Structures are given as structure tokens and as C-alpha cells.
Amino acid sequence: MSAGPTCEKPCFQVCGGGHLDRHLWLQAAPVMGRTNAARQTVSTGGVAANIASHLAAAGGAVRFTGVQPPQEAPAMVTRLAASGVDATILPLEGEVPGYSAVMGPDGELLVGAAAMALYDDVLPAMIMPHLDPTAALVIDVNFPEDVVLALARSGASGRPVFAAGTSVGKVARLRPCLQHLHALVLNRDEAAALSGNSDAPVDVLAQDLALVLADGGVVLVSDGGATAALASRTGSVTLEPPQLRVVNANGAGDAMAASLFSGLVTDPGMALATRLQIALAAGADFAAGPPHPDLAEPS
């Protein structure tokens, strides 16, 4: 796979959700019905925007295309530029998108709230003219199914198309896209929902989905601190993620996805086992430390 002949660096076009994430980190076990002491981080969020920032941090030349209400667009461009991402934020009237999460003292998500109605109004005609046609394309599933499918089909030009699951509720939008994808990263719940096989182990889920991807495509299925799997049409490997004290589990999957996608472009001949090990290490590094400096700012 190639990122495109015009790029001196590995070149990526990322498209999807880009908004503000607010994380409230509880300092002790939650007490319902009471005010709980917490610290807050405000970050550039959205699966696609997070992956874009990780790809840029790894040395990629990254372009991002997303939407915001007109008054919010300049600030999002500035935030992504600070992470090394060249952003095109298209104006779209509507509610400001955002995500808020309450995290337990163990670093695990307690409850999240997503206000994403703006993304439901995105149309293919708004997005497609603003994409770099030569770069490897990375998408999430925040936009409607017809937009996601149009993005996936753009791989017919010869560039690789990579996708990351966004939520169990949205992952079905990928079903008509699978044959166009060269890599797919999901958690276990998303993979089970997409395959319709809730009882299968992660290696079976990954292998079944890999069989319907584009030729040479790979599927990574993670399961938190349990076994993860990476599969192609011809085989699969499993690995236990590194054992660690979790500080920030929310967002580790985006770091893992970025690592896999970057490696597919920069080293297409890498063995599956090595790819999985590197991707899991990237997710573990994110989960074990404070929010990535390019992704979060104390507030």
C-alpha cells in the first residue's frame, strides 16, 4: 500500500468527527446524587480527529476534513494545527457537536454523553470535493451511511481506505463499505454487532470480517485488557495487551488504530504478529499516561 507519490512523508487524508471532548476525572469513587470532586481536561476529540493527531505525532503528513458551525470552525482549525494537522473545517449550521465523559479514578469510563446531531446533516456532496485523492484515507463512522459509503468507495482510485469503529450504535454504517476497506479497527462489541456473532472469540470475529474486506485487508479487534486479534483473509494472530495501571482508557483505541494504519502505509510487508504487538503497545502507552499532550489541555 502506498500513501501516494506526491508525499515525502506518509500521507493521510482523515475525514469524520472533530469536536471538543470534555473529560471529568473523579478523584474518588463516585457518589450518585452528590457533587463529586474532579479535574477536567478539554481536548480535540472525535475518533477521526484523534487518529489524525496521532498520525501527525508519528511523523505523517495529515490532512483532516470535518464540519462545525461557522462560528466554531476557525477554533477547530487552530486546535488541529497545533497537533500538526492541516484541517479543512466546512461550515454547517446547527448545534455545536461535543462529547463529555465522566471517568472513574481507575481511568475507566463511567458515563459518556455525545451531542452529535450536526453530523447527521452532512452530505456526500459537501465532503467529497475537499479530499486529497492521493493520500491514504482514514474514516470513522460519525457521518451518515451514505457519506461513509462514498468515502469508502473512493478507494477505487487505488488508494488504501482505513476505518475505525465509533460506537456500537453507529458501526452498522460500515456494513455496505466492508468490501472497499483495507483495514478496520473495532472493539469487541462493535465487531460482534457488525458480524452478528455476539458469542464468537475475537480471533473469529476478526477473521470473519477480514474475509469480506478488500484484498489484503486486515481487521483488528480489541477487548480492553483481554485478548486482541489481528486477521487477514489468510490467517490471524492473537495477543494479550500489556498489563498496566490504566490512567486513561478512553481514547486508547484511537491511538491503536493510528499505529496500525501508519504501519500499513510505511511498512506493508510487516508480519501480522508484529503489527498487532506495535498497535497494542501504542494503545497501552496512551492508556498508561496522562492525556496525550497533542490531544488534551488541562482546563
What are these language model-derived features?
Residues 183-185, 190, 205-241:
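Conserved phosphate-donor
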Residues 1-65, 74-75, 240, 246:
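Glycine-rich phosphate/adenosyl-contacting loop at the front of the ribokinase-like
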Residues 99-141:
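Conserved phosphate-binding/catalytic loop of the ribokinase/pfkB sugar-kinase fold
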Residues 215-218, 240-299:
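Conserved post-catalytic alpha-helical subdomain immediately downstream of the catalytic base
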Residues 56-57, 156, 265:
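Gly/Ala-rich phosphate-binding loop of Rossmann-like dinucleotide-binding domains
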Residues 2-10, 28, 78-83, 87, ...:
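Charged C-terminal helix
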Residues 136-204, 226-227:
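Conserved beta-alpha-beta core of the PfkB/ribokinase-like small-molecule kinase fold
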Residues 41, 65-70, 86-97, 164, ...:
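Beta-strand->loop->alpha-helix junctions that form or flank phosphate-binding loops
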